[in-house]
Amino acid sequence: CCYRCRVENTGNEQLAKLNFDNEYCLFSRRYRREEDAPCGNDPMLMFFTSGTTGYPKIATHSYKYPLGHYITAKYWHCVSKDGLHLTISDTGWGKALWGKLYGQWLCEGAVFVYNFDRFDASDILPMFAKYHITTFCAPPTMYRMMIKEDLGKYDLSSIRHATTAGEALNPEVFRQFYNATGLELMEGFGQTEMTLGIANLTGMT
């Protein structure tokens, strides 16, 4: 297929149309790295902490930071090349990056994104069968809301592995989700200032 980019010029009525394939052919296949290109320990991104002990503080991460989430995706989320991963996290949270993008892409996993203003279990639950989502991560509160919606009404057979983080996991939520799906919720703990710190990884009980 042919990708097109439409650029609007606010000054006049003209619209520029670019053919992606044609533009791509104009670039060299050899990547030339500039000497002053950012890498290694150079700052890559800054998160703000939640500010539980005062004002939010900046947590700066280097270009090495995404590599730490290979473990997150491979051994906690268990993403795979043939799978589709869904992490529910607002993009304002660090979990959106380390739960949706860095490790998941490093593991060659596809990422499912669903935009909503307010979480509604009855909207999310049909997505698993419709799009064949294979790995899933959400906070325990969302699992509770899904259980209240009655998991038995939905086909969740595509899910191979389920994880949770963000707050303490209630044993009753664990039990009810297990009874409905046969899957054990694998819990993890991370912080804005670091990667996934403590978790039930693959092979652990």
Protein language model features and the residues they cover:
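Short beta-strand->loop structural element characteristic of the AMP-binding/adenylate-forming
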Residues: C1, K57-T60, T87, A110-D117, ...
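Short beta-strand elements of ligand-binding domains
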Residues: C2-G11, K17, T164
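Conserved pre-ATP/AMP-binding loop-to-beta segment of ANL
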Residues: R6, A16-F48, Y55, C78-L84
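Conserved structural elements of the adenylate-forming
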Residues: F27-Y31, A59-S80, G94-K95, Y143-K148, ...
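Conserved S/T- and glycine-rich ATP-binding loop of Class I adenylate-forming
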Residues: P43, T49-T52, H85, F128, ...
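Short hydrophobic "strand-cap" motifs at the C-terminus of beta-strands
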Residues: M46, I88-S89, Y114, P139, ...
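Conserved AMP-binding/adenylation subdomain of ANL enzymes
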Residues: L67-L84, T91-T134, E149
